[in-house]
C-alpha cells in the first residue's frame, strides 16, 4: 500500500501516512493516531486531552476507561509501541492560524534536522534509478511469489477437487446403501404386517376351534351321561328279560308237568 489516511473517531481530523519503502534510505514514521490501551479505539492526542477526566480517559465510543494510550513508531522492519499515561498529555502551544508542521519540526528538532537540498539536486537521477530498480526487483519478487502461490493454489484446488470427488462417491455409496436399507426395511415391514395378519387369523381360528372343542366336550359329556343311562336301562331290561325267561321256563315246565299228569 503506497499511502493510507487515518481519521480521529471524534474530531474527524485526517492524517496521511506515505510509504517510502522503495527508497534506499531509512524512514522513521510515527503513526499520528493514538490507541487507547484498554479498548483499542483510536483518537487524536487533542481529543484525548479534552475528554480526559483526571488520570483516566473514558472512551466516547464504548465508555471503557483507559489509564494509558499507545503510540506506534515504525523504523525499517521494526515496530515499537510507546505506552503513555493519559495524564501526561498537555497543550504546548496554540495560534490563530494552522501550524506548518514541517517548519515547526525544523525548529523543535533542529539538532536532528537533515539538510538534503543539495543531495536532492545532485542525486535525483540516482534516486529515480534506484527507485526504478527497487520497483522492478519488487515486481519480480511479487511475480515469483504470486506464481508460487498460484501453483500452490492450483495444487490445493486439484487436491480439493479429488477430495470432493472422493467424498461425492462416498456420499453416493451411502445414499445407495441407505436406499437399499430403506427398501429392505419396507419389505420387512410388509412381511411383519403379513405375518401379524396370519398370526391374528390363526389366533381367531384357534379361538373358534377352542370354542367348538368346548362345545363338543360339553355335548360329549351329555352323550356320555346318556350312554350311561342307556347302559343302565339296558342292564335293567336285560335283568327283566332274564327274569322273564326264567319265569317262562318255569311256566313251561309247570304246564308240561300238568299236561303229563292229566294224560296219565
Swiss-Prot record:
Domain of life (superkingdom): Viruses
SMART domains in UniProt: RING (SM00184)
GO cellular component, one term: host cell nucleus
UniProt main location, coarse: host cell
Single GO molecular function: zinc ion binding
Zinc fingers typed RING-type, residue spans: 8-63
Places the protein is found: Host nucleus
Keyword field contains Kinase: no
Signal sequence range: none
Keyword Zinc-finger in record: yes
Keywords, in A-Z order: Host nucleus, Metal-binding, Zinc, Zinc-finger
Function summary: Plays a role in the proper expression of late and very late genes.
Protein name per its UniProtKB record: Zinc finger protein CG30
Native source organism of the sequence: Autographa californica nuclear polyhedrosis virus (AcMNPV)
